[in-house]
Structure formats: C-alpha cells, structure tokens
C-alpha cells in the first residue's frame, strides 16, 4: 500500500495543472509519471545546446543547414529524449525526491519500473546513434556510461562532491555541443574546440546553482553534493570564477577564429551572468529555497543568452 506521504505527493503531482490532469486521464495507470520523469521542460534547453554545435559547424545558411538536417534531427532527438531524458529519469528513480526538482515541479512518486525504463530508453538511443557519424555514437556511449556512474548505486557519483561536478561540466557543457557538431561529420576546428571547452566551466558555474534550492533536502538524505560541501557562499563564488574563466575562453576563441567585429557581442551574456550571480552572492544568507530556485532559472536564461551570442559571433 502507498503510505500517506507518497499518496499526498501523487495527488499533488496529478492535480498540479490542467496539463497534468489531462495527461493522467489520457495515459493508462501510472504511465504518465514515466513521461514526467523524463522532464520535458528541459528538452528545449538540451535541444538548443545540442543544435548549437550543429549550427557552429555548418553556419546559419539555410542551404547548409538543409544538407545535414536529416542526421541532425535524428541525432538531436536521440540525445535529448533517449540520453538526457533517460538520464534524468534514472536519477529520479534513485533520488526519490518528494519536493520540486530541476525542470519538474511537484514530481510524482517514481514508478516501480522507472530505472529499467530509463536504461532501456538510453540503450535504444545508443543503437540509433550507431546509424549516425562515428564521433556522435562514441560521444553518446561516453555519456551513457557517465549517466549510469552518476545515478546508480553503489558508485552513485552524484552523491560524491566534485565527481558530480566534473561529470556534469563535461557531459552537458562540452560533450553536448560536440555531439551536435559530430552530427555534421565535419572536422573540428581550433576555435570550435575552444568554444566547446568554454562551455565546460560555464556549466561548472551553473551546476552548483541547481543544488542550492535543494540544499536542506540533500542534507537530510545524506548526499554530499558539491553545494553542501562548499557551502552556499563558496558555491556562488565558485560559480562566479567559473563564469569568468568560461568567458575568457570565449574571447580567446573569438581571437583565434574569424569572429571579426562581432566579438564584443560576447559582453552581453557576460553581463547577464553577472546580473544573476552578484546579487545572489550578496543576498544568499537571507534567501529562501523558492528564491534560490528562481535564481537557478535566471541563470538558465543567461545560458540561453550565451548560446545566442555564441551563434551570432561564430556562426554568422
């Protein structure tokens, strides 16, 4: 039988809004919970960051985009839905969070077979990746392994401060746009490598920000997340320093590549990041979890501005 806390969690998840109520009415049994734990709210963010790599490779010319559209659309779907969605669902299966989590407000209790579902979905994506350029398939396989190491006991590197940070900064920050570039089959250029490396410290900045609003819940569960080990102030300082390192690499890439007069556009996302991080650092001691959560989403908007600026500088 379902205990009272789990029953309350399930009721809130099902009644949160009209879309939830409609989904649970249409989908049989608990099957809509499987979809929710793929966290569709993150799909546009992941798709955009993967597509960034593709557009950096081919440019913004409609003709060049059309040449690689077939492989790009299939590869992005596999990366976003199978790999990233499966990773997040696998994470949910072992975290068993009761409160809000990244990209999923009022999560339903993890269904019984969520872990098996997630692993199967990621494996299906790996088979599909073999139909695409070899570098993409290799990139997918590397992230598949990292996802399992990150989420699944006994290793569960998510709960090991520092290891969780490294996996995410490389997996989302660098390997995701690399996957998009790999879908085109084009050789990597030096400036492109610098851009992809720049996204590594930029995600290093974002990652602890995603943990601050779950600070107390992670502490109660016994996880040693990066934010818990560093503390809030040092987490925010680390985010600020990592952001500055990322933009130093972006500016270096602009100097190496053919950015021309467009390189000053990189100052816009830098200003957006500083507008999020500096007030957060100044006010963190008095902020509530909901305010930390809003800060995380503000940082995600700064990330989106960064992607757009990078495209404007390097792909036009």
Language-model features: locations:
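C-terminal ends of transmembrane helices
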Residues: 88-97, 101, 146-161, 207, ...
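Acidic (Asp/Glu-rich) catalytic motifs at the cytosolic membrane interface
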Residues: 79-105, 205-227
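Short, Lys/Arg-rich, polar N-terminal cytosolic tail immediately upstream
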Residues: 2-35
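Membrane-embedded alpha-helical segments that form the functional core of polytopic membrane enzymes
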Residues: 47-90, 137-148, 188-209
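Small-residue-rich segments of transmembrane alpha-helices in multi-pass membrane proteins
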Residues: 47-53, 165-181, 227-235, 293-310
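Multi-pass membrane catalytic core of lipid/isoprenoid biosynthesis enzymes
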Residues: 92, 96-141, 224-258
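Extended hydrophobic alpha-helices typical of membrane-associated regions
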Residues: 20, 28, 32, 129, ...
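Intramembrane alpha-helical segments
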Residues: 35-36, 105-187, 191
């Amino acid at each position: 039988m379902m205990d009272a806390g789990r029953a309350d969690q399930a009721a809130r998840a099902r009644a949160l809004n009209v879309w939830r109520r409609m989904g649970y009415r249409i989908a049989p049994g608990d099957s809509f919970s499987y979809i929710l734990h793929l966290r569709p709210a993150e799909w546009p963010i992941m798709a955009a960051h993967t597509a960034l790599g593709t557009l950096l490779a081919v440019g913004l010319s409609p003709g060049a985009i059309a040449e690689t559209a077939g492989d790009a659309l299939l590869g992005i779907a596999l990366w976003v839905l199978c790999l990233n969605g499966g990773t997040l669902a696998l994470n949910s299966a072992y975290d068993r969070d009761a409160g809000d989590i990244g990209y999923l407000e009022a999560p339903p209790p993890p269904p019984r077979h969520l872990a098996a579902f997630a692993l199967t979905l990621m494996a299906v994506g790996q088979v599909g990746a073999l139909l695409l350029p070899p570098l993409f398939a290799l990139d997918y396989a590397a992230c598949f392994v990292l996802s399992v190491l990150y989420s699944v006991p006994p290793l569960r590197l998510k709960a090991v401060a520092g290891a969780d940070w490294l996996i995410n900064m490389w997996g989302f920050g660098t390997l995701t746009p690399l996957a998009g570039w790999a879908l085109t089959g084009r050789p990597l250029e030096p400036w492109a490598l610098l851009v992809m490396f720049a996204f590594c410290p930029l995600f290093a900045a974002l990652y602890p920000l995603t943990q601050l609003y779950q600070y107390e819940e992670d502490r109660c569960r016994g996880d040693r997340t990066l934010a818990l080990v560093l503390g809030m102030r040092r987490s925010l300082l680390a985010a600020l320093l990592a952001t500055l390192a990322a933009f130093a690499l972006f500016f270096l890439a602009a100097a190496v590549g053919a950015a021309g007069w467009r390189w000053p556009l990189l100052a816009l996302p830098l200003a957006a990041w500083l507008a999020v991080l500096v007030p957060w650092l100044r006010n963190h001691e008095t902020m509530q979890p909901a305010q930390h959560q809003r800060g995380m989403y503000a940082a995600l908007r700064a990330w989106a501005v960064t992607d757009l600026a990078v495209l404007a500088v390097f792909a036009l």
